[in-house]
Amino acid sequence: MQDDPRYRVEVEVSPRFLAHQSTPEEGRYAFAYSIRIQNAGAVPARLIARHWKITDANGRTEQVDGEGVVGEQPRLRPGEAFHYTSGVLLETEQGQMQGYYDMVADDGTEFTAPIAAFVLSVPRTLH
């Protein structure tokens, strides 16, 4: 079902470093990421769950799974978008996140919306 154009959701991510919430001397680097989820398909669909793989610069990986996003399970009509912002703490100046959303269309079809890997980096540390 992943290749069926009726069931397509596009995800855009904008990460940023939160210097005021970070304490580098304690190995605490805070990042926010703003997400835009748009139903680019032809059928209304609801976001049911999220699945994240978070990797820091030391190769330490954490898997985060949960229902919905920011306490919601938004239903998106074709062309409609949902925006939210969340955050993550890393022990290193750099890392990355990637994952996917579990979706279910109004006709009962289940599918996933991939979230491409994106970089989390303290400014001026990316080489």
Swiss-Prot record:
Gene3D superfamilies cross-referenced by the UniProt entry: ApaG domain
Coiled coil: none
PROSITE patterns, sorted: APAG
Biological processes per GO annotation: error-free translesion synthesis
Domain ApaG: 3-127
InterPro entries, per database record: ApaG_domain, ApaG_sf, Uncharacterised_ApaG
HAMAP family according to UniProt: ApaG (MF_00791)
Protein name: Protein ApaG
Native species: Xanthomonas campestris pv. campestris (strain ATCC 33913 / DSM 3586 / NCPPB 528 / LMG 568 / P 25)
Gene designation: apaG
